[in-house]
Amino acid sequence: FPTRRSSDLTALATSGTVYDLSLLDKVTDSQGKTLKEYGSSVVNQMSDVPDNVWNDIHEGMRRVVLTHEQFNGLGVTLSGKTGTAELDIYHPNHGLFIGYTTSSDTSEPEYSIAVRIANGYTSGNACLTANDILKYIYNLADEDTILTGYASSDTSNTSND
């Protein structure tokens, strides 16, 4: 699920450029010598979508992030979408977040992220995880404060958000 959603999200972030999904950038040997590099390849361009529609999507996703306190003070330009998926009345909802960051220099997309927490109760918990991942990627916090070996405090244990 997360890799497929991340790929779809990249198409949104790039205003319609669909890339062949690759999980690897390169392979190196034990001395750091690059053995193989993997480039990205465009498989489709959604050119029939007007610019104003892309702008509305980007603005809407930016506003979603601004309404979630889990991202307050992150220091990274992030746009995203939250969600919950219900299984049944006997199990907690799955918590979901997809998002992308943009470069402060060029406003071009840098990273896409997809978090799914099975039976995670609320999307807020997925937002907390995404926040920690972004702090790690951008070196915004000491690794020891992010990777504690313990779960973060949940945002809510209600299954109806």
For each feature predicted by the language model, list its residue ranges.
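Active-site beta-strand/loop architecture of penicillin-binding DD-peptidases
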Residues: 4-44, 58-145
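Long, compositionally biased intrinsically disordered regions
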Residues: 45-46, 52
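Intrinsically disordered, low-complexity repeat and linker tracts
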Residues: 143-161
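Residue-level signal for protein termini and structural transition zones
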Residues: 52-55, 121, 155-161
